[in-house]
């Protein structure tokens, strides 16, 4: 079983493994994954579902692997937001902090530091109480979540993506948005976003990306994947890279969501074939390209933003250095969640390897023991 980390819930592997174990005379299962996850219970869950007994781990530095892997150059490039974008950030941070303070005064939260998952869980708990104060708190939490998303787009993505989001917000009919639209900080944030978008000012990452790709395309055989989290960002990346001499970018995204655009599996397959044949030399890709793709060779992988997930970090980086040396370039915005996400994924990957080594060194059944059972 390849990509064994997918073995959760009702994934087909579970049924196949169970049927095989029931019918095979001498069953023996090998499960492979580059990214099993960092938590022991998750790894054990995969083991149980695939009837796996022993765990083995190999990294690029292990002596029996080293002769067969190619060198990967890792570059981490940090950019700084310009003054106008920092001003915009200040407006958004002021809104978020004022709402967080309200929630603390209401006794709904006890700390200034709450993440999106905690806020969503809190909304669920408040909804169960069905009280006036609870409904008000839920609405304020909605404001925090919306503003934090806007902040994330400003810090890590593009002005274009932020403008698309604020335009969408303005069409929402909710109490949370109605209150935001009366806030001077929000009014100023929208004004500045519109001004920056109108004058063509973009996130410094985009300029740095154009610089990087221009340099990499000096290699006429270059094959490059640029990963980004959001489709609006991918569209802007495609637009910017299309201006580079010798660049032949293409958007590679998942299937359509509601009214949004998307690619069918047939279209995805066609784009990959054309990428391999050289019709395109840059994939501007979403998460759909992170695993399971039969890409012949990619010289360079660019993370437009770091991912906090160790699994996704490994999958993205795994798109290069398959048959020859490769390069992984990670773009980060200074003093933003980009840096936090980068170190989070690094820490999780380190923890994952440690967990696997501990599981490997624990009591395991040998092949001889297995046959004698």
Feature names for model-found ranges:
Residues 28, 36, 317-348:
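Conserved segment of the helicase C-terminal RecA-like domain
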Residues 254-258, 280-281, 287-323, 334-335:
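Conserved RecA-like helicase motor core of SF1/SF2 enzymes
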Residues 223-227, 233-287:
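Conserved helicase ATPase core of P-loop NTP-dependent helicases/translocases
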Residues 81, 331-373:
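Non-catalytic, charged low-complexity extensions flanking SF2 helicase motor domains
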Residues 25-30, 222-223, 278-282, 327:
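Loop/turn-to-beta-strand initiation segments
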Residues 12, 16, 42-43, 52-66, ...:
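Helicase motor interdomain insertion/brace
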Residues 24-28, 50-53, 72-74, 246-247, ...:
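Short glycine-/polar-rich loops that comprise or flank the Walker A/P-loop
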């Amino acid at each position: 079983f390849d990509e064994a980390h997918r073995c959760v819930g009702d994934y087909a592997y579970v049924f196949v493994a169970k049927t095989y174990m029931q019918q095979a005379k001498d069953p023996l299962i090998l499960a492979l994954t580059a990214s099993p996850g960092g938590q022991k219970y998750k790894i054990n869950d995969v083991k149980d579902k695939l009837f796996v007994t022993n765990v083995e781990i190999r990294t690029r530095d292990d002596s029996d692997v080293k002769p067969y892997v190619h060198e990967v150059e890792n570059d981490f490039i940090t950019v700084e937001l310009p003054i106008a974008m920092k001003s915009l950030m200040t407006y958004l941070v002021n809104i978020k902090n004022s709402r967080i303070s309200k929630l603390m005064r209401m006794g709904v939260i006890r700390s200034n530091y709450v993440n999106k998952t905690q806020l969503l869980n809190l909304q669920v708990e408040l909804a169960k109480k069905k009280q006036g104060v609870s409904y008000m708190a839920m609405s304020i939490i909605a404001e925090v979540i919306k503003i934090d998303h806007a902040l994330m787009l400003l810090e890590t993505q593009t002005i274009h993506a932020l403008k698309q989001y604020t335009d969408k917000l303005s069409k929402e009919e909710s109490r949370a948005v109605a209150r935001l639209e009366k806030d001077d900080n929000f009014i100023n944030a929208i004004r500045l976003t519109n001004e920056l978008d109108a004058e063509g000012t973009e996130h410094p990452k985009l300029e740095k990306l154009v610089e990087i790709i221009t340099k990499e395309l000096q290699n006429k055989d270059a094959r490059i994947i640029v990963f980004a989290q959001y489709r609006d960002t991918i569209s802007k990346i495609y637009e910017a890279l299309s201006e580079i001499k010798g660049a032949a970018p293409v958007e590679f995204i998942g299937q359509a969501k509601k009214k949004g655009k998307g690619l069918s599996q047939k279209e995805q397959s066609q784009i990959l074939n054309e990428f391999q044949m050289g019709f395109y030399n840059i994939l501007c890709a979403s998460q759909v390209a992170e695993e399971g793709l039969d890409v012949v060779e990619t010289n360079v992988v660019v993370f437009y933003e770091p991912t906090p997930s160790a699994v996704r970090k490994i999958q993205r980086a795994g798109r290069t250095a398959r048959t020859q040396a490769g390069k992984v370039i990670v773009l980060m915005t200074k003093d933003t969640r980009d840096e936090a996400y980068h170190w989070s994924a690094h820490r999780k990957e380190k923890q994952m390897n440690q967990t696997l080594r501990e599981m490997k060194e624990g009591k395991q059944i040998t092949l001889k023991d297995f046959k004698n059972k």
